[in-house]
Amino acid sequence: MEKVLQGDVLRVGGIAHPVLVVSNQEFNQIMEVIVCPVLDDLSPNAIHPMITVRQQNTEKKTCIACEHLRHLDLKARKYTKLGSVNYSQMMDVCDILIALLEYR
């Protein structure tokens, strides 16, 4: 199985849409990940940031549904890596996740 990193975009068996890995490398080492869906039909807003997914020689703009966090066990599912997002965009997504979970 290919190593999964924070910022990777995966196609996972049994899930209709790609997902962005938001969990950190330490958590990902056990092949369990926390992900957010990558959805083409969303409009960018405060909780749906637009990202650019790098795939080999191409780039695709799409949105992340940050409010739909999921835990996946990659040991139990087939997956392929589609691409990744850059560090700056990953920081933006993590900032949104922190804001969504902030205690007030």
Protein language model features and the residues they cover:
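Conserved functional hotspots at enzyme active or ligand-binding sites that engage polyanionic ligands
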Residues: 1-104
